[in-house]
Amino acid sequence: MQPRAFITGIGMVGPLGMNTTSTWNAALAGTSGVDRITTFDPEGFSTQFAGEVKDFDASDYLDKKQVRRLDRFSQFAIVATGEALNHARLDPKTIDPFSVAIILGTGIGGTDSASKQHNLLASRGPLKVSPLYGLHMLPDIAPSLVSIHFGLKGPSCAVVNACSSSADALGQAFRMIRSGDSDIVVTGGTEAAICPLSVSSFGIMGALSQRNDDPKTASRPFDRLRDGFVMGEGAAILILESDRSVKSRGVEPLAELAGYGATSDAYHVTAPDPNCTSASRAVELAVKQANIEPEEVDYINAHGTSTPLNDKTETAVIKKVFGDHARHVAISSTKSMTGHLLGAAGAFEAALCIQAILNDTVPPTINLANPDPECDLDYTSDGAKHRPINIALSNSFGFGGHNAVLVFRSVT
């Protein structure tokens, strides 16, 4: 019999708060974490707002050298991992360091470092570029630094799959547990891409909302007036453990990761396949692996990016897989509050799925004021809803046609 995979700890840093509790409470209240960009002057950019991590002071958590050298996405990962380990009652000093693997997802990596070092190169010449830049912009530096900071010596790697990166990281961690290769995996995702290069590039692409006059209403998944996604940043780390490890440590799991499905569209680098074949298949694979019927899913945390193409395509995917149940299952897009955390989004939304299960509450989709006729399901648009949630499903559909779907189950 294959080992089962349980979540025993969660750590979160994001636009809604500096920890899991504050993030969940803000989500329940329908709070928008989106506002005018403060980390650089956005004047002149087509999009001037984002879902930033507010009041983040790395010196509250890290030493002076780490504050000075580490890219923001690595700092987020370390802080969120610390909360997750504490939540799981895992002390790195007292456990076998080789027993813990690390798999983290990020869509871009150290793009903030890239932007800053490019400015130095342009303004002060090649001798002023940091010799550490080549290290701290790499996607794999985040799991490496988590390993070093906490002394964890199991295998570590980064998953880079655009918007599905951290969902795929959880999926690979799930497979490590199920195969018996590891009993404990620190997994999730981190992203800090709100910098001039990324904001200008995505803006020129036409992917970002330009609702500069009212940023808090800009992320409006499934709304007829949606005009693009809103960039967000942050990290979410989950501690995944085998049933054997959970039993031997005597801890109470939060939820079970029961299924994972992944496919590729093989269609277009930015547009989803309108036929929904591959995205639907990913959902079906996750549901099948969880050994459940589609009708048993109580809540879907939608990818819901607030882009014209994604939202109507995802609605079609849900209808295709769930049939009549699509009209009854609760759906929401928490990106309406956080913006799109890119490579960290899948893990962030997985953490919110687990909170939904623990609290039997569906977080809302805010800003859905003008329903799109092509998006006609229950998106929880009038506030958080209390209802029994035994099984939650999270969709992540990334640029490049990466589809990753996770199924979580209650353990009570």
Predicted region positions:
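ACP-dependent fatty acid/polyketide chain-elongation machinery
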Residues: 1-66, 244-256, 351-365, 409-412
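Phosphate/pyrophosphate-binding loops at sites that engage ATP/ADP/AMP, CoA/4′-phosphopantetheine
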Residues: 84-96, 245-250, 283-299, 321-325
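A glycine- and small-aliphatic-rich helix-loop capping segment at beta-alpha/alpha-beta transitions
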Residues: 21-28, 112-127, 176-179, 199-212, ...
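Conserved beta-ketoacyl condensing-enzyme motif
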Residues: 7, 23-24, 28-161, 190-199, ...
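Active-site-proximal alpha-helical scaffold in enzymes
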Residues: 77-90, 139-142, 147-150, 155-191, ...
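Condensing-enzyme catalytic core mediating Claisen C-C bond formation in acyl metabolism
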Residues: 4-8, 31-36, 213-290, 299
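Acyl-CoA/ACP chain-elongation machinery
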Residues: 181-227, 260-274, 304-311, 328-378
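Glycine-/small-residue-rich "gating" segment that lines the acyl/pantetheine channel
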Residues: 123-130, 171, 175, 192-248, ...
